[in-house]
Amino acid sequence: MTGRVYVKTHGCQMNEYDSDKMADVLVKERGYTRVDSPGDADVILLNTCSVREKAQEKVFSELGRWKDYKTRNGAVIGVGGCVASQEGEAIVQRAPHVDVVFGPQTLHRLPEMIDRARDGGRSVVDVSFPEIEKFDRLPEPRAEGPTAFVSIMEGCSKYCSFCVVPYTRGEEISRPFEDVIAEVASLAEQGVREVTLLGQNVNAYRGPMADGTVCDLALLIHYVAALDGIGRIRFTTSHPVEFSDSLIEAYREEPKLAGHLHLPVQSGSDLVLKLMKRGHTAAEYLDKIERIKAARPGISIASDFIVGYPGESEADFEDTLRLIEAVGFDQSFSFLYSPRPGTPAASLSDSTPAEVKRERLYRLQETINANARRISESMVGTVQRVLVDGRSRKDPNEISGRTENNRVVNFAGHPRLIGHFVEVRITEAKPNSLRGELLGLDDDMAAA
């Protein structure tokens, strides 16, 4: 049976990658067409995130709004991702109109699960962890523009006390080296110029190679950089403990590795880091940052921060602010701590008033935003290498792209430049983007 599928995504880049694969597997195996509105779809899928409590509640709000599509149109409603993995049957109990519940490791089984739900008239739940089977069953890679995500591993084995990822995505499993290279090469042939290598703990990648050896992330980056057409490489998300000497050296040796790094620290307090079971101190984190900056002068460093963790004192928070100033973090993500069921941190006592936590979060965000503004302002007058990825959202008569440090630049130029690296002189720093003047094609542009 053919039909139309709509996919909505909550959460991280890994979820965006998985959502594309959900649609692709239905397109390939059942002839579906992907649509942009749930009202036009025969199958409506929600790919969920369980990192934050509010994100989890958004799932059931969304499902409530979708109930009418099932009643009026007979649409099949499916829930995937980390909330599905965590809640399983409980989703159907709370939202009985849901037909299919599947985890991150079972999205490749979607066609069969949808068939079973339709034929049997009852909900189908499969949130098992069939190890590498997901990667073995992925559809052929399909490019949608000059940038692409490629998942190289799944899961996390760090078990930080606040985090649900090991429980929702399982232990770390690395995708075979040859499979990763084949996917990137295929995407490059389709016009992809920048690839982001994905994993919950991506620098723990240990991909088996055909000769029996193991490839780490640093070596993988060198192989990806050697592929025709690839002009820029990013990776996310990293853990400081796994940030190896060879990966630091990759920043010195490989010019195609973008000068921008997202390396979550969560806190600058050694006490809080210990409670979080992060496995490192603030000084050890700072030492790695200094070595990375020495290997790649001018690199932009972004991070994640949790404010109001149980037991965090004002002194602990001040330690975090000092680390932020020492590193000079660029645009980063920061949240109030949200206890997740089943994690060790959920049982910790917490006596800090909510208004104190909110005030700390505001101070932290103001500090980081001020750093980010200074970085943007320092770029005015410089010439940046920009990958043009589409028309400008602000002005359809202009084009836009991203710099190495991940800033959006809008500038006048012909749409035929989409998919090309160009040189742009930055003329203005705006709150959420830059403006620039096109100078020409980049001399070192990857073959297009």
Swiss-Prot record:
GO MF terms, alphabetically ordered: 4 iron, 4 sulfur cluster binding; metal ion binding; N6-isopentenyladenosine methylthiotransferase activity
Residues annotated as domain Radical SAM core: 142-374
Occurrences of domain TRAM (ranges): 377-440
Cofactor(s) the record lists: [4Fe-4S] cluster
Entry keyword Nucleus: no
Entry binding sites for [4Fe-4S] cluster 1: 12, 49, 82
Annotated InterPro entries: Elp3/MiaA/NifB-like_rSAM, Methylthiotransferase, Methylthiotransferase_CS, Methylthiotransferase_N, Methylthiotransferase_N_sf, MiaB_methiolase, rSAM, rSAM_horseshoe
Name of the molecule in the record: tRNA-2-methylthio-N(6)-dimethylallyladenosine synthase
Gene name in the database record: miaB
